[in-house]
């Protein structure tokens, strides 16, 4: 518990307090015991002013650049999560159903390959690709790069969940002549929904906090 507090909770608390300090790193209010030294200017300033260390920027809640970046990040993260999660789910399903096939092993290894590549290398590769295809500095290129990079997270999660599922359940549905899409939507996904949801959340969370992959593409 002590380790968790000092490595996970305390940094977040200090980071939150930092946003209310009049000057970065000025913790004099603790020494003097005067909370009035704190300020909300970094949050609530709604005009472009240069004094008080604002450098011509509005506060966080009124800063169009920050909200625009936040919106763009969510768009890219959601699209990457949906695409990578769906592709990973299909890869995991196919590999689990053909686990003795050499092609299944090949597909499984190829799906895991982007995880072994540094994010900067993937970013450079898509930088060259996007420049040659005329899609540089577009959402399309960001989503393509993110999807390829984060497929391993989704495919491993899906494969793990599919390997835990008994084959007899789907075999019973096949005997009753239930189509594949209904077997997936009504049987497989509901049973393994927690693992499948994590296969979508992992790409989303990783995409939100990843800078190295996208810094060359924007």
Locate the predicted segments by residue.
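Membrane-proximal transmembrane or re-entrant/amphipathic helices at the cytosolic face
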Residues: 33, 39-42
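Solvent-exposed soluble domains appended to multi-pass membrane proteins
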Residues: 183-184
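Glycine/proline-centered hinge or cleavage motifs at structural transition points of membrane proteins
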Residues: 176-178, 190
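Membrane-water interface segments at the C-terminal ends of transmembrane alpha-helices
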Residues: 2-24, 42-54, 59-163, 187-211, ...
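Short alpha-helical segment that forms part of, or immediately flanks, the ligand-binding pocket
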Residues: 170-171
């Amino acid at each position: 518990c002590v380790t968790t507090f000092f490595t996970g909770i305390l940094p977040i608390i200090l980071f939150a307090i930092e946003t209310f300090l009049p000057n970065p790193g000025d913790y004099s209010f603790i020494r003097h015991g005067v909370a009035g030294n704190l300020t909300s200017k970094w949050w609530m300033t709604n005009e472009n002013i240069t004094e008080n260390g604002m450098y011509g920027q509005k506060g966080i809640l009124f800063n169009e650049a920050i909200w625009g970046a936040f919106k763009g990040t969510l768009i890219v993260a959601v699209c990457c999560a949906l695409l990578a999660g769906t592709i990973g789910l299909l890869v995991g399903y196919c590999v689990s159903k053909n686990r003795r096939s050499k092609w299944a092993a090949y597909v499984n290894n190829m799906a895991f390959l982007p995880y072994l590549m540094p994010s900067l290398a993937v970013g450079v590769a898509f930088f060259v690709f996007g420049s040659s295809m005329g899609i540089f500095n577009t959402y399309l290129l960001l989503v393509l790069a993110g999807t390829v990079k984060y497929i391993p997270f989704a495919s491993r999660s899906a494969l793990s969940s599919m390997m835990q599922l008994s084959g007899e359940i789907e075999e019973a549905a096949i005997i009753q002549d239930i189509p594949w899409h209904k077997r997936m939507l009504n049987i497989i996904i509901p049973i393994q929904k927690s693992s499948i949801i994590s296969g979508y959340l992992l790409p989303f969370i990783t995409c939100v906090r990843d800078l190295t992959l996208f810094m060359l593409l924007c």
